[in-house]
Amino acid sequence: MSFLEGVYWDLDGTIANTELEAHLPAFNNSFNDFGLSWNWDISNYIELLKINGGKNRIAHYSKNTKLLLSNDEVINIHKRKQYHYLKIIENNKVCLKVGVYRLVKELYKKKVRQFIVTSSSKIQVDLLIKKLFKEFNPFDFFITSDDVKFPKPDPSPYLTAMKLSGIKSCKSIVFEDS
């Protein structure tokens, strides 16, 4: 009989609804800071989530408007978006998705190793986990966009995590929303 030894969690949209509670308002706040009249609504943002990475979303949206942004402008807007995102997290504006805390804690009690594999940056993950799991960190390690050459949906982040964990794929499960 095979027992579960490892769980690999996606973060945004799986552990917490960060996309709508933090990323979306952070994008809109950064657009406002730069004097752009852009205001992404929920349906527009959900469509933009098909594009991986915040900078890529900004660049894509720019191409579809009359305002073409330079690469430097995209980078600066994205840096400002990161600032707003971290402020939102710091102010406890994001919650765990229903049932996640209970499942994470139960797996932790049963000594099932848990890992986060995400397209978010390390600074985002560190702060979010600190805020969401106040009394403990149930995760052995994180694989973030800072750790891999090709972010998700490329399989390399998960393959990297599985290699680092040393757990066979037949004894693992992935929770992912994309």
What are these regions (language model features)?
Residues S30-N32, G53-L69:
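Helix-loop "lid/cap" segments that line or gate small-molecule binding pockets
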Residues F27, V100-K130:
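Substrate-recognition element of Asp-dependent hydrolases with the DxDx(T/V) motif
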